Amino acid sequence: MGFLPFVFPFAELEVGQQLYWQIGNFRIHGQVFMTSWLLIGALLALVVIGTKKMERDPRGVQNLLEFLWDYIRDLARTQIGEKVYRDWMPFIGTLFLFIFVSNWGGALVPWKLIKLPSGELGAPTADINTTVALALLVSLSYFYAGLSNKGLRYFEYYVHPTPIMLPFKIVEDFTKPLSLSFRLFGNILADELVVAVLVFLVPLVLPVPVMFLGLFTSAIQALIFATLAAYYIGEAVEEHH
């Protein structure tokens, strides 16, 4: 291929390189921890700014926080039910905000300008370990919700409306976290890779509309994840199970 007058720099696009930290017997992904804590810190700073001086007529950041509070409250109430939705608002809100900020942080922050010994920074939700951990938290949460509200009666769900459903309900418990984690991971990673390829090919114009589309899909993915988490919890506490 030496006759080609140019070479596309696709070899510079690498997926899977990691910066590892060794903590005792555990080896963790350092770049995921760094970006996660930076984004969590930015989110906490936003909350502090918005609640530092509360006003009856909310403006600016306070207005944004109150809008988010109302939105998460309505989402939890709709999916979980009037009886226990307040207990689960902090969990659903934390999931939504962390995923939303992580997705948008990956799309808006030029992480690749920060050089690391190995690997590169990016959205925490573009790492399968993060999305699997979030999905497992959701699974543990709806098990806890069902058992805490119904006790051992919760397991009647697995044979409702007929015992034939038992193997299907067990398989469903495995497919729920799989679908949650891989949907979020796949969408965010694909968005980052598409933008990276387009930046190499047409660095000035073409990536911009794709980035805006990525922001939209990132917000949708955060909403889908939080809505499904609330739905699974609501399903576990429903009395007819």
Curated annotation (Swiss-Prot):
Keywords per UniProt: ATP synthesis, CF(0), Hydrogen ion transport, Ion transport, Membrane, Thylakoid, Transmembrane, Transmembrane helix, Transport
Pfam families the record matches: ATP-synt_A
InterPro entries in alphabetical order: ATP_syn_F0_a_bact/chloroplast (IPR045082), ATP_synth_F0_asu (IPR000568), ATP_synth_F0_asu_AS (IPR023011), F0_ATP_A_sf (IPR035908)
Keyword Transmembrane: yes
Source species, domain of life: Bacteria
One GO CC term, this protein: proton-transporting ATP synthase complex
Membrane-protein topology: Multi-pass membrane protein
Matching CDD domains: ATP-synt_Fo_a_6
Residue ranges crossing the lipid bilayer per the database entry: 30-50, 91-111, 128-148, 193-213, 214-234
Subcellular compartments: Cellular thylakoid membrane
Principal subcellular localization: membrane
Family under the similarity heading: Belongs to the ATPase A chain family.
HAMAP family: ATP_synth_a_bact
Known role: Key component of the proton channel; it plays a direct role in the translocation of protons across the membrane.
Protein name: ATP synthase subunit a
Organism: Prochlorococcus marinus (strain NATL2A)
